[in-house]
Design a protein with these regions (language model features):
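Generic hydrophobic, amphipathic alpha-helix propensity
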Residues: 1-5, 22, 48-52, 56, ...
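Short hydrophobic clusters on alpha-helical segments that form packing/core surfaces
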Residues: 1-9, 81, 150
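Amphipathic alpha-helical packing segments from all-alpha helical-bundle domains
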Residues: 57, 105-132, 141-144, 171
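Helix-turn-helix
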Residues: 4-43, 47
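Amphipathic alpha-helical segments used for helix-helix packing
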Residues: 72-76, 87-109
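Amphipathic C-terminal alpha-helical segment
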Residues: 84-87, 105, 127, 147-164, ...
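All-alpha amphipathic helical-bundle segments outside canonical DNA-binding/catalytic cores
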Residues: 72-75, 112-113, 131-147, 156, ...
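Hydrophobic alpha-helical connector segments
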Residues: 61-88, 143-146
Length: 180
């Protein structure tokens, strides 16, 4: 149910997905949904965001553990995103910005769930940078730049229907890392 609802929320946005659409896609009754999520659709969204958080951070951690430096790991993540976009035409497993922009100002619990994911990703980046010899202060700043650059490039790729923004940061981010 969470995987199906996550895809619906990512494709259409929270407000555009009706409860009946979720029930039909998941082939469950309203009672079953409310049994698992007594607070309804918003509680389901938060569960979807938590699941997405786990999947994304597990993948990023895996990639970062496979590469010796932040520069190599960052390049590998960006290349994976480019491949996903070129192969599948989507980045749905990696971004949830549409949900953030739609819901963050309306629901504190959704904003908190979204914020947790961004914090975890930034923490993964920061830890790798510190392991590479960056000071804590520099690692915090550079990890924020990395997160904002990658997330922004993903949004631009989707709106432009092009992988060029990710390809651009694939070139520029390693240069930024070298300059520190």
């Amino acid at each position: 149910m969470i995987d199906i609802a996550t895809k619906l929320f990512q494709q259409k946005g929270y407000k555009s997905v009706g409860l009946n659409e979720i029930l039909k896609a998941c082939t469950i009754s309203k009672g079953a949904l409310y049994h698992h999520f007594p607070n309804g659709k918003e509680e389901l969204l938060i569960a979807c965001l938590q699941s997405l958080n786990e999947a994304i951070t597990t993948d990023i951690e895996s990639i970062f553990h496979q590469h010796e430096t932040t520069q190599e790991a960052t390049t590998a993540i960006i290349e994976k995103l480019i491949t996903n976009l070129e192969t599948d035409g989507t980045l749905s497993g990696y971004t949830f910005s549409s949900i953030v922009s739609e819901m963050a100002s309306l629901s504190e619990s959704v904003r908190t769930a979204c914020g947790s994911l961004y914090e975890k990703i930034q923490e993964i980046y920061r830890n790798k940078l510190v392991a590479d010899g960056f000071s804590n202060e520099s690692a915090s700043s550079v990890s924020l730049l990395m997160l904002a650059s990658i997330e922004g490039a993903m949004m631009l790729c989707l709106t432009q229907k092009s992988t060029d923004p990710l390809k651009t940061i694939a070139i520029l981010l390693p240069n930024v890392l070298k300059s520190y």
